[in-house]
């Protein structure tokens, strides 16, 4: 059967893995072997870093020597900059695994005489490829060539000749080029993309008040790839792409329940939250969201589970003080190695960097529970699409690692119904707890409701909810009131005789069930 499959299966072009985090996912396995890829972007988008990482990973993971042709930076600067990421290029050069071909402008600024001709460079490059048996080549960047010479038509012809020679040598090549706009022509001189089999665009777009890095594969000739833009960040290990579209809903669904830390809330949820589920507590400020998060974290730690709390609105000291007033000692749990609290301002960095920090902390600490307080703080100043992608990234990674996540969301509306569908967060979460203020007989009261819980029975009632010195106290439903959610509850007139019979009957049912047990 295997032979039959081999005969009838359509051949797929062989690919070379870049080992750049996330890129091999969105490119369905890497770059086509022996082909040229154009990496285009505005200044500072990470083109040189991407291409250098492609070379370094080829040497590190596959023992594939590489050649780097530089038209802009000096070899000294390239080697120096690579040290930031822990890449010892000088050591690789000394070992004969990497060669940097310097085609950067003469610092003396000599006048250009005669016709433009890349023949000498092509011969030097061919010699280096054969001498070092290079499999990967980077040319950074051809825009510098166009800027030095005026004969654009001649340069195009020479670049085409260079690409053709590289194809003959069967090396996998990345050529970088500048563009002037984030969304516009692929490259400055309009035809660079036609001399390349593959085009990758990197962007650093200002969205709202923050910049957001994305990568898009425009084409991979003769093979498949994922469409659209994918967020990425630059860490101390290089480019890190988040292949959100490559995430598959393949995680196992657990029937195991975990406690919220509040007995009444567990009962309202049919026995607690499902393990590996994502819970969202949404409500106005002061409704008790952070308290529920604290009880959830405390319960996990009391059971010997590790937990991480990512806080974006309060400092560590403030969180510890508030938790202590409810009898929860965060500092003790941290000393025991069961809890890690990470506090940072949402505006301190972009969403992709926040996502990378969350993933990195989870990978290092290996918690069973995580909490984010709050998502709404992270949503400030970013587009709905960027925020949704962030939430998908966090929830997807938590489910992949089989972690129970508890997130909070602060609504703008102080009283009355509020939207929980902004940025479509509600569709991504498994359980939603709605917390709100209501006015009853001239006094403010809090209400809690299990708005949604996937795969489980849950209490549909809207219950009164108090915050005491011991934590949350959930009472009975607001019986005899309607329109609680609207924020303008009205008392329902009742038949006193019928209500008395209902109370008597409930006691009789309880007595009979106690007798039978």
Per-range role (PLM):
Residues 62-149, 305-389:
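Conserved inter-motif catalytic segment of the P-loop NTP-binding fold
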Residues 13-14, 123, 127-132, 204-263, ...:
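Conserved P-loop NTPase
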Residues 26-92, 268-330:
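Walker A/P-loop NTP-binding active-site region of P-loop NTPases
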Residues 72-76, 84, 104-108, 143-145, ...:
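Conserved nucleotide-binding/hydrolysis micro-motifs of P-loop NTPases
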Residues 37, 113-194, 199, 291, ...:
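P-loop NTPase motor core
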Residues 34, 62-65, 96, 169-171, ...:
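Short glycine-/polar-rich loops that comprise or flank the Walker A/P-loop
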Residues 291, 297, 313, 506-517:
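Terminal-proximal interaction/regulatory segments of ATP-powered molecular machines
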